Regions:
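Flexible, glycine-rich active-site loops centered on histidine and acidic residues
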Residues: 4-25, 88-145
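Conserved catalytic cysteine-centered active-site region
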Residues: 76-84
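N-terminal beta1-alpha1-beta2 module of alpha/beta enzyme domains
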Residues: 1-75
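Short linear capping/connector segments at secondary-structure termini
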Residues: 50-53, 84-87, 128
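Residues at helix-coil transition
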Residues: 74-77, 108
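Glycine-rich "substrate-gating" loop/helix at the edge of Rossmann-like oxidoreductase active sites
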Residues: 57-60, 86-91
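Hydrophobic residues within beta-strands of alpha/beta enzymes
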Residues: 45, 81, 111-113
């Protein structure tokens, strides 16, 4: 098997859209990157499953991963689409599976779905998720998988 390479699509998490003021224009820039990757030799495009910027939360736009993945899947035709990685703590396993299966159908089988235990405490608390210790989060992750 030959190596495969993917590219992260800017989505705001890493302060990579701050030079564009309008969120609609930010999304257009994301689509442009995705389409360029789709027309190149890249195997996949990726977005982060985060809600706030890093290293510090700001008021800048961060696009939600699953909604973005669904939209980019419809804007592209060949390239695989994935999240790096889905946070188990943000969605019950059954909701994660339902969402993933929907995006997989929308992409005609081009979804890469990853799952992790989560680490960004600020996001958990900001959205009302209980922040637990690592053993508890890992236990929930094992149960979900």
């Amino acid at each position: 098997m030959s190596p495969r390479f993917g590219v992260f699509v800017p989505q705001g998490w890493r302060m990579d859209l701050v030079e564009i003021a309008d969120p609609a224009d930010q999304f257009d820039a994301m689509v442009s990157v995705a389409k360029q990757a789709d027309q190149s030799a890249f195997d996949s495009i990726w977005v982060y499953d985060h809600f706030h910027t890093v290293p510090e939360p700001t008021h800048n736009t961060v696009f939600e991963a699953w909604t973005t993945s669904a939209a980019l899947a419809r804007e592209t035709s060949r390239i695989n689409v994935g999240q790096m990685v889905g946070c188990n703590g943000y969605r019950q396993p059954s909701l994660y599976a339902k969402t993933a299966s929907t995006v997989d159908a929308m992409s005609r089988g081009r979804l890469y779905a990853g799952l992790g235990a989560g680490w960004y405490e600020h996001e958990w608390k900001a959205y009302g998720y209980e922040w637990t210790d690592i053993p508890t989060r890992m236990g929930c992750f094992r149960e979900a998988v």
